[in-house]
Amino acid sequence: MASLASKDSYLQKLAKKVCTQPSQEPRKRKNEFIKRDGSEEPGQPNKKKKKKPRNKKMKAQSDKRTWNVPQITSNPQKLAKNGQTPSSTGTAASSFSTVDILRKRLQEKIQESRSQLSNKSLTPEDAEKRRQRRKQERERKKRKRKELKKKAAQEPEGNEVKDTKESPETTKEKDPVPIVFNNVEVSDELPNKVMQKKAKKERVKGTITPMTGKNYKQLLSRLEARKCKLEELRAKDEGKAKEFESKIKWTNVLYKAEGVKIKDDEGMLKAALKRKEKKQKQREKRWDKRTELTADRMQQRQDKRRRNIMKKKQAKVDKKKNRARKKGRILPEDLAKANFK
C-alpha cells in the first residue's frame, strides 16, 4: 500500500510539472514601460508622438511612400492558403516597397546630374547657337593676337625711322658750347613731360643759367668767373668771345620776357650786398640788446622774489616774538634795548 501511495504522489507531481510548463514567448525588456521619472507602469506603454512633416517637400515624399507601398491583404484565410502568415507578408512588402523607392530616387538624381552636364536637355537650335557663339569667340581671339603681333613688328621699324629723321637735326643744332658744371644731368630713365620741357627750354634759351636770386655773394662770384672766361676767350679767339656774349644777351632777353629779374650789374650787386650786410648787422645788434634786456629783467624778478621771501620770513619771526612777549617772556633783544636806553 505504501509503495502504491508513493507511486501515485510521484505521478501527480510529474503531471503538474508537465501541465504548468511556461510558453516559449520572446522575452520582454525589463524596463519597457519605465517613465522618465523612474516610476513603472506595467499596463500602460508610452505612446510615441507622430512627427508632422515640416514642409511641403516632406509631405510630398510621405505621399510618394504611401503610394508606392503595395496593399497588404487583410484576409487571414487567403494568406493561409498561400502558406504565408500575415506578419511575414507585411514585413516583406514593406521592405520591398522601401527598396523600390530608394532605387527610383537614385535613378532620378543620376538623370538630373546627367542632364545638367550634357546638352541633351537643350534643343538642337540652342546647341547650334552655342556652337556658333564659341566659334565666333575663337575667331575674334585669333584676330586680336594677329593684330598685336603686327603692332609689335611695326613698332621697332617706326622707332628706327624716327631716329634717322631726328639725327640730322641734332647734328645741325650741336654746336661747341662751353660746359657749365652746375647744369650737368645724367639719367638713364625715359624722358617724362618735365624733362621734355626742360630740354625744349635749353634748346631755345641755351644752357647758360640766368643771374637771378638774392644770394648776392654767389652772383658776384659768378659774374667774376664769367668775366674771366670772356677775357680768356678774347685772348684766344675774339669770334668765340662775341658769340658767347650774344648768347648771354639772348638768354637774358628771353628770361626778362618771362618776367624774371636778371641781376648782372656788378655795381648794383655790390650795393645790394652792402645793404644786406648792414641790415644783418642791425638785426644782430637788436638781438643782442633784446637778450641783455631779457637777462636784466629776469635778474630783477629774481631779486624781487628773494626780497619778498626774506620779508615773509622776518614777519613770521616778529609774529612769534610778539606772542612770546604777550605771554610775559623777556627776550634778549628787549634786555639790550633797556640797557642801551
From Swiss-Prot:
Leader sequence segment: none
Listed Basic residues bias regions: 46-59, 130-149, 273-284, 303-329
Pfam families according to UniProt: SURF6 (PF04935)
Q: Tell me the compartments it is located in.
A: Nucleus, Nucleolus
Molecular function terms, GO-annotated = DNA binding; RNA binding
Task: Specify where the region named Disordered lies, as residue ranges.
Answer: 16-98, 110-184, 191-210, 273-341
Q: Where is the composition biased (Polar residues)?
A: 68-77, 113-122
Alphabetical GO biological process terms: ribosomal large subunit biogenesis; ribosomal small subunit biogenesis
Identify the main location. Answer: nucleus
Lineage, top-rank taxon, reads: Eukaryota
InterPro entries according to UniProt? Rrp14/SURF6_C, SURF6
**What family does this chain come from, according to its entry?**
Belongs to the SURF6 family.
What the protein does comes down to:
Involved in a nucleolar function.
Q: Which PANTHER family does its entry note? A: SURFEIT LOCUS PROTEIN 6
Q: What is this protein called?
A: Surfeit locus protein 6 homolog
